[in-house]
Amino acid sequence: MKKENQVNLGRRQLLKSTAAGTVLTGIGGTLSFTPIVEGIAAELPAPLRRTGVGEWLATTCQGCTSWCAKQIYVMDGRALKVRGNPNSGVHGMSSCPRQHLSLQQVYDPDRLRTPMMRTNPKKGRDQDPKFVPISWDKALDMLADKIIALRVANEPHKYALLRGRYSHINDLLYKKMTNLIGSPNNISHSSVCAEAHKMGPYYLDGNWGYNQYDVKNAKFILSFGADPIASNRQVSFYSQTWGDSLDHAKVVVVDPRLSASAAKAHKWIPIEPGQDSVLALAIAHVALVEGVWHKPFVGDFIEGKNLFKAGKTVSVESFKETHTYGLVEWWNQALKDYTPEWASKITGIDPKTIIAIAKDMGAAAPAVQVWTSRGAVMQARGTYTSISCHALNGLFGGIDSKGGLFPGNKTPLLKEYPEAKAYMDEIAAKGVKKEKIDQRGRLEFPALAKGKSGGGVITANAANGIRNQDPYEIKVMLAYFNNFNFSNPEGQRWDEALSKVDFMAHITTNVSEFSWFADVLLPSSHHMFEKWGVLDSIGNGVAQISIQQPSIKRLWDTRIDESEIPYMLAKKLADKGFDAPWRYINEQIVDPETGKPAADEAEFAKLMVRYLTAPLWKEDASKYGDKLSSWDEFVQKGVWNSSPYKLEARWGKFKTETTKFEFYSKTLEKALQSHADKHKVSIDEVMKACDYQARGHLAFIPHYEEPYRFGDESEFPLLLVDQKSRLNKEGRTANSPWYYEFKDVDPGDVANEDVAKFNPIDGKKFGLKDGDEIRITSPVGMLTCKAKLWEGVRPGTVAKCFGQGHWAYGRYASAKFGVTPRGGSNNDLIADRYDRLSGASAFYGHIRVRVEKV
């Protein structure tokens, strides 16, 4: 058979399988047909060999926070191939490998195809929901009745909206409608993503956001756990440029495991989990003692003589700073004692190595960039690791410098819809003033996003609030694009919490672990192929805004999560007498050209995107970047690009209390003082309540906090290293066959297996060999998988990739759907702990485990 015939046969069989499969009717639901996808893998330069002529259509991948602009090759109504959008100024046609898995996502025969209703009133992991199909009208009628009942009872605050991954049209469903109903409980996933990562940049240079790294011009890259070519932000761009960067920059990766980026680096330092700040602080110490800090940015001694000597204090008046604040205070309070020898005792890293790295960074300055990652900072005391590592970017002058790092470029994109307070009645106005269910802002949970007490979300703690009914119970919940039972530490807490919610509706593409506890399932259109939306991304010195648009006809009776569903729900609420959301939608979210509201939910989905993006194409956006002539041009190109970032743009006007890069953070001092005053305690009492070790001025400077460990070392001798796969689309590729077939693209992993990786030294110690069935146990849970002996993991640790261990989601994700997991979920082992200053969940550094053969 010819290749082109094989391709078309595969496509026809795929169509047949997806049309013939059935929806789930509980655990025993029929899951027949395995799709054949030869057509997806084939190259497509000769479209005439197919049945028709194809075209590339622009969209955006929402599968991770890279938010890459894409083009979908569509022929005969089928999506066949994905590539980077060549109009992107960030990554061009480059893409990460997981883009291809999206094809298996959209054509997944196990996708939820129609609304479903629970018929088993009992909730629990061991309870078959016995879902049965219902109409959209019935599903939304049930949800609307529950919301109306809360308002009639004057308890609208007992409604909660839970958000997972989102696009920029989320504001209506996430915030506006939640507040109009009368609830403060719009709970995002952010604190299980990377909130602790933002603490260093914000409290040192005022950027509450993620940085872009000028790897094209870098001369030294120091990465604390970041894996740019596999799982860090903007993987497409870094995958394209990393090889060239290795030619002109020295790359050092600090990570307990040999990541994809570490495997290509000039030096890999397999550090003990939780000790990253030790190395960072020792490097800073050497930089000052050796006089290799970047003086044009930082400043110098007035007399020109270096007075930094290990263990000796320095007069503040002797040093004149330029664009920084508090260097000498930092030295005197802590840094003078953080010698390479001190660091070596803790980390085992040779002092000569530390000295060499510091000198190399000084020689390369200011074309120096220091990366942090989830692994280094999403720990129980991770704020200070984030601050300590980021301080090096200031010390070596990489901030806003060529070859360094800088924040995102300014764009005119709107990210919110008009204010809705005028539409709030007395019931809503009273309800939104209630404490949030995640308990943010309490003494023990500062969550200091952007310097505000309670300014950040504490996603995982919402489960504790719900299950303990503290500060109150949640009776009605709407959730979308999330699976917190699987993605949160100690996810079994969510099983308990959701079992207590009277009514929950879940918007989802697949029946997940979270869905298992739902009363109504609402099938979502796929974000990349069937949705209208808009996203942005940064990299390569520019910001891009890219569109999501339907490239194929939606396969089943699905609706778009952030537009069509809230529109339909608002109309249903209005029919029942509560018309505030409906009036707001039709009076405020109108077409930017005609001024008219949408005629139906399908038109509204596009209108929402037109509204937010109008400043790009309706107005002259050339002040910020590209000039677009029309909406149609934006849709066709799919991308708007900003002008290049202006180097040194923030020097002298950082958004900190001093307008300087703060080694002594007056910004953090102010935030902590505000939180302390709120609770009528001292800052030291705040630090104690939040389980940090710093007292006094130490709390405001980069310093070492001993890593928190959970579990007795004698019983649990190994430290867990939770890692992310380059094939993960945040856990949502688990029902893609290719995810397992190509699993060995992750260093040390094995195709079609779920393995935990042990150093051969530990393998010998615990009597393990490759392929052994093992049980890994922590103080809070256990999992089973297979052992893999591998030199790419530090002795004393066990590295395991997050992503497997589903007991729901579909036929490939689970061993037996609804019953038996395929492999093990890392989060079953990870105790519910927090970096309390940021509100971030701690996934790393603290979990001790033991291993035994099964």
UniProtKB/Swiss-Prot annotation:
Residues 1-41 form the signal peptide. InterPro entries: Arr_molybdopterin_subunit, Asp_de-COase-like_dom_sf, MopB_CT_Tetrathionate, MoPterin_dinucl-bd_dom, Mopterin_OxRdtase, Mopterin_OxRdtase_4Fe-4S_dom, Prok_Mopterin_Oxidored, TAT_signal. Residues 54-110 form the 4Fe-4S Mo/W bis-MGD-type domain. The keyword Oxidoreductase applies. It is an enzyme of class 1 (oxidoreductase). Its cofactor is [4Fe-4S] cluster; Mo-bis(molybdopterin guanine dinucleotide). Arsenite binds at R165, H189, Y210. Phosphate is a competitive inhibitor. SUPFAM superfamilies: ADC-like, Formate dehydrogenase/DMSO reductase, domains 1-3. Binds 1 [4Fe-4S] cluster. Its EC number is 1.20.99.1. Disruption phenotype: Deletion mutants are incapable of growing on arsenate, but are still able to grow on a wide variety of other electron acceptors as efficiently as the wild-type. Mo-bis(molybdopterin guanine dinucleotide) binds at C193. Predicted to be exported by the Tat system. The position of the signal peptide cleavage has not been experimentally proven. It is found in: Periplasm. One of its GO terms (cellular component) is periplasmic space. Arsenate binds at Y166, S190, K198. It comes from the Bacteria. It catalyses: arsenite + A + H2O = arsenate + AH2 + H(+). [4Fe-4S] cluster binds at C61, C64, C68, C96. Keywords: 4Fe-4S, Iron, Iron-sulfur, Metal-binding, Molybdenum, Oxidoreductase, Periplasm, Signal. Component of the arsenate respiratory reductase (Arr) complex, which catalyzes the reduction of arsenate (As(V)) to arsenite (As(III)). ArrA is the arsenate-binding subunit. The periplasmic localization of this complex may allow the cell to couple arsenate reduction to energy production before arsenate can be transported to the cell cytoplasm and enter the ars detoxification pathway, an energy-requiring process. Heterodimer composed of one large subunit (ArrA) and one small subunit (ArrB). This is Arsenate respiratory reductase molybdopterin-containing subunit ArrA. It comes from Shewanella sp. (strain ANA-3).
